[in-house]
UniProtKB/Swiss-Prot annotation:
Transmembrane segments: none annotated. This is Chorismate synthase. Belongs to the chorismate synthase family. One of its GO terms (cellular component) is cytosol. One of its GO terms (molecular function) is chorismate synthase activity. This reaction introduces a second double bond into the aromatic ring system. GO terms for biological process: amino acid biosynthetic process; aromatic amino acid family biosynthetic process; chorismate biosynthetic process. Pathway: Metabolic intermediate biosynthesis; chorismate biosynthesis; chorismate from D-erythrose 4-phosphate and phosphoenolpyruvate: step 7/7.
Length: 361
């Protein structure tokens, strides 16, 4: 099975399944001499961790990460960093009824078509449980980017269902279980989630992730444009069905005179491009959005087929998120951090000696 690694100089490889013994990861390309402890990774893992809110799955995993290699006396050695998170709260019996049935909207059918078999326990490798290791690896990148370059990465929920959420106050994001920046909408979100749980249904969401302090010049045209790699990374997250950079699809309704980010002696006058021009960072905030589908793990009866091709009706049992977009916020932050760190290392490797007289803001 290919496709388990992302990055070129900063490379992250993950392994493990939802109901396996553990999740693991190998992080290559971390420079030596960076102070790093398990506590540095645990904060973001706790933000993603299941069972911490009545609005998310009640699978209770401590997600305690162990650093197995690549760190000595509290600092990175420059060698591969091995990471491990044990699975401790599996209920594989919840999935025995779907052993021979393909859940509609899930990867069951396509995994079996590709591999001829599948781990039906919680989706196996296709489960979003895998993203815990991405968050751990992303925390390493976030720490390096922040401490060495002053780059800050943060994300929030900007829409749930038909409820838009304006970015009014970033401080609010960590003060509520929705990662919501609009305190005025918390009651509406609570009401929606309660209704979904009662109905046994789910809802989609939009997550926005932003990076500030990114220097101009990151990105490798033409196939490894910065926005292309960000889109690739975000699209690799479970349930993501669309990615926008900057204004995204809103540019369809704009004119060139409205959309172009004009430049004065004081700097850029707008940021419709989301901080990336020609696939290269402009020095402005990098802004990306991703749309997450409503999970198909619901108790509303649905039609599907079994291995024999017979039509059956099924209800998904187990513990699931009514809105997977909530816990996707730290995952999006991690993936953006991984891409930015990889591109920063690549830029320094080729262009460290480049000097220009062009203003930077």
């Amino acid at each position: 099975m290919a496709g388990n690694t992302i990055g070129q100089l900063f490379r992250v490889t993950t392994f493990g399944e939802s109901h396996g013994l553990a999740l693991g990861g190998i992080v290559d390309g971390v420079p030596p001499g960076i102070p790093l402890t398990e506590a540095d990774l645990q904060h973001d893992l706790d933000r993603r961790r299941p069972g911490t809110s009545r609005y998310t799955t009640q699978r209770r995993e401590p997600d305690q990460v162990k650093i197995l290699s690549g760190v000595f006396d509290g600092v990175t050695t420059g060698t591969s960093i091995g990471l491990l998170i044990e699975n401790t709260d599996q209920r594989s019996q919840d999935y025995s009824a779907i052993k021979d049935v393909f859940r509609p909207g899930h990867a069951d059918y396509t995994y079996e078509q590709k591999y001829g078999l599948r781990d039906y326990r919680g989706g196996g490798r296709s489960s979003a449980r895998e993203t815990a290791m991405r968050v751990a690896a992303g925390a390493i990148a976030k720490k390096y980017l922040a401490e060495k370059f002053g780059i800050e990465i943060r994300g929030c929920l900007t829409q749930m269902g038909d409820i838009p959420l304006e970015i009014k106050d970033w401080r609010q994001v960590e003060l509520n279980p929705f990662f919501c920046p609009d305190a005025d909408k918390l009651d509406a979100l609570d009401e929606l989630m309660r209704a979904l749980k009662k109905e046994g249904d789910s809802i989609g969401a939009k997550v926005t992730v932003m990076a500030s302090g990114v220097p101009a010049g990151l990105g490798e045209p033409v196939f490894d444009r910065l926005d292309a790699d960000i889109a690739h990374a975000l699209m690799s997250i479970n349930a993501v069905k669309g990615v926008e950079i900057g204004e995204g699809f809103n540019v369809v309704a704009l004119r060139g005179s409205q959309n172009r980010d004009e430049i004065t002696a004081q700097g850029f006058q707008s940021n419709h491009a989301g901080g990336i021009l020609g696939g290269i960072s402009s020095g402005q905030h990098i802004v990306a959005h991703m749309a997450l589908k409503p999970t198909s793990s619901i108790t509303v009866p649905g039609r599907t087929i079994n291995r024999m091709g017979e039509e059956v009706e099924m209800i998904t049992k187990g513990r699931h998120d009514p809105c997977v977009g909530i816990r996707a916020v730290p995952i999006a932050e991690a993936m953006l951090a991984i891409v930015l760190m990889d591109h920063l290392l690549r830029h320094r490797a080729q262009n460290a000696d480049v000097k220009t007289e062009i203003p930077r803001w």
